[in-house]
Amino acid sequence: MSPCGYYSKWRNRDRPEYRRNLRFRRFFSSIHPNAAAGSGFNGPGVFITSVTGVWLCFLCIFSMFVTAVVSVSPSSFYESLQVEPTQSEDITRSAHLGDGDEIREAIHKSQDAETKPTFYVCPPPTGSTIVRLEPTRTCPDYHLGKNFTEGIAVVYKENIAAYKFKATVYYKDVIVSTAWAGSSYTQITNRYADRVPIPVSEITDTIDKFGKCSSKATYVRNNHKVEAFNEDKNPQDMPLIASKYNSVGSKAWHTTNDTYMVAGTPGTYRTGTSVNCIIEEVEARSIFPYDSFGLSTGDIIYMSPFFGLRDGAYREHSNYAMDRFHQFEGYRQRDLDTRALLEPAARNFLVTPHLTVGWNWKPKRTEVCSLVKWREVEDVVRDEYAHNFRFTMKTLSTTFISETNEFNLNQIHLSQCVKEEARAIINRIYTTRYNSSHVRTGDIQTYLARGGFVVVFQPLLSNSLARLYLQELVRENTNHSPQKHPTRNTRSRRSVPVELRANRTITTTSSVEFAMLQFTYDHIQEHVNEMLARISSSWCQLQNRERALWSGLFPINPSALASTILDQRVKARILGDVISVSNCPELGSDTRIILQNSMRVSGSTTRCYSRPLISIVSLNGSGTVEGQLGTDNELIMSRDLLEPCVANHKRYFLFGHHYVYYEDYRYVREIAVHDVGMISTYVDLNLTLLKDREFMPLQVYTRDELRDTGLLDYSEIQRRNQMHSLRFYDIDKVVQYDSGTAIMQGMAQFFQGLGTAGQAVGHVVLGATGALLSTVHGFTTFLSNPFGALAVGLLVLAGLVAAFFAYRYVLKLKTSPMKALYPLTTKGLKQLPEGMDPFAEKPNATDTPIEEIGDSQNTEPSVNSGFDPDKFREAQEMIKYMTLVSAAERQESKARKKNKTSALLTSRLTGLALRNRRGYSRVRTENVTGV
């Protein structure tokens, strides 16, 4: 047996153990000149000793080894053999030989394992356990679905939009206004407005015939017949003019722009009537079940728009008496803009309490449909799954599910438009896309999908498949002669009579998210199922192929193949057509493994070991077992693996978690696993990833469709009502009412009623009155000026002052006329002494004139001074005669003006009377002195 070698790695060389082990190495280097790489021996270190000493040492060691081997039986060794590698920062693999000299024990302690490798002890199989390879399997064939059919589809939904048509509204706007005329203002005290329907006779004979409308309105209110006239004048036909403002899709015509109102003379009430004939072309809307329709004016007509007198239309709904409804065949309506007659049509007229509405009658079945097209899909795949049809539409990212039975469209009320429209769409798509590559298979098919959708489907078949089917059909007809089969009293699925439910309707959901989720689920399911099916089939085929390979490789290396198949370390051997296996237990923690540094056979120069030599040492004292290192850390309990020695020998062996490198059958160094390149025997599984599917924002019903669901469009009604005043009345025109103008109008009407002569006189009178009114107007205008008002104020103030003084003068004339007329003459009367009687007689009164009284202020008056009674009486007579003279002159003047005899005669008589009364004497003016 060759000497033992060892290798180790040291970090702390100053330790006592290192120095002691170094002595041991020097000792062993004298025994074997070629030290292992990394063992610490730098040279051959040949130490010549005596032959006796060498043999003594060898015999001692060999005897100890033999004793240890003999003392341990194989069975007890396998029972106690375990591996427990030690672990440290720098661990050396060591081997402990149990009881022996301390040199061998030190060598074993110095070799610690670097990591925790797992080693297996594989005893040779004895044939007690045999196995065999499973024969090849039959791989399954998976089908994801059946009856896949491609085609074209048109999807329909419930029609929730209103039926729209044009209607014409005829009415007269009657406004009666009562106004109070003040001195400088006008006030409306009452206003009555009403809409009056226009009779159908006036529409047909006047409006649509001449483009005019009467200014007279006749209507019934409070069960009484009432008439109104525009501007309170005699009725006349007035031309219809277009309105100033029109909304989208609406036009209107009317007869006047003004609202008539009368302002009378101040302090009176006047009433004015305005009649405006209005014709509006508006939009009418009706929703299912079409028993009424609404107008954009806000009015609701409780009659079906399809009510008529022919083709059974009289069965439609109506809430009005028949005398209010009129239908004319071939009626030609007049275009009020171009004045041209339109094409003949069946025209309906309905008279309501407030308006007359007219519209063109059309049959119901040709105008409305309870279903409407939602989407056209050019490529659809239909498959049968779980007794249902699934229509997959990738362009819409949706999947619709329906029953396998076709749906009869005749069950749905007013669904006659679906097949005709769908057929036209399918023909167009087929002609433009599939005409050269596919053929149609049968007629179009109709299915009711979940959610209330109707799918009209046209199956298609590619030309290549069609040719294969034809060839197969020809082959079958050739091989099998035609035989007559007894007819069975059965029907095909499509011809099964279905009990129809009258007037059935469907309700479509407003969201299509459920179909999109169904499409996503089906897409994921299809992808996963297809992937799993391919994996299963490929896996089965791969197993069959690997089985054939393993069957051929088992004779070469049965242990490796058996370990791979059984997923555990075993030892195998071929025994004919079966394989004998034995289990390979792991070494426990109470064992150590020593790797020797030489692979040469001791005593031979041509024989070498093909695997490194090892020694398995039990730490519990059970002994040491010699063997070889097998593949993949397998420990072989024999040293039978030999080979001829070759030159340039280089080998790498896995030992634990590292590779050990041998060159020329000598240990060189240890190599880490990651420093050795790796080639993989595995085949990557190429799987297709799940494709990205984005949800498209699909709308079943658009915003316009949802807005059209109601009977009335309130936005259009509000727009029309707010525009009504702008369309038919001039809101910018202002009429200034004048009381003088009212007087003139009243006088003019009065003179016009007197005939031609009265009108001539009226012109003269109205001219003079107009001049007077103009003067008054100018005066009032002057007063309205601030400066004119100030001047008038000053004049009024001056007039008041003058009036005050005049009033005082008149009072003075009344109380003392002589003082007022002769203030200087009567001035001396104020100077009479107190107590003096002005009428008392005095001596020599005739000699002293009255003017001398009080001539001198220093002369005291005489007690007997006073007035002369005769003079006083003469003065009285003179005043009387002056009054008579004044009266006579006035009478004569009047007589001359009037040229009347009685007045002249009276004047003459008055003069004669005055002449007969001349018995007075003249008052002396000079001073009379006494004789």
Curated annotation (Swiss-Prot):
A motif (Internalization motif) lies at residues 920-923. Disulfide bonds join 122-584, 139-540, 213-277, 369-417, 608-645. Residues 731-784, 764-784 are annotated as: Hydrophobic membrane proximal region. A motif (Di-leucine internalization motif) lies at residues 904-906. Gene3D superfamilies: 1.20.5.1890, 2.30.29.100, 2.30.30.1230, 6.10.250.3280. Its main location: virion. GO terms for biological process: symbiont entry into host cell; virion attachment to host cell. The chain crosses the membrane at residues 787-807. It is a single-pass type I membrane protein. HAMAP family: HSV_GB. This is Envelope glycoprotein B. It comes from Varicella-zoster virus (strain Dumas).
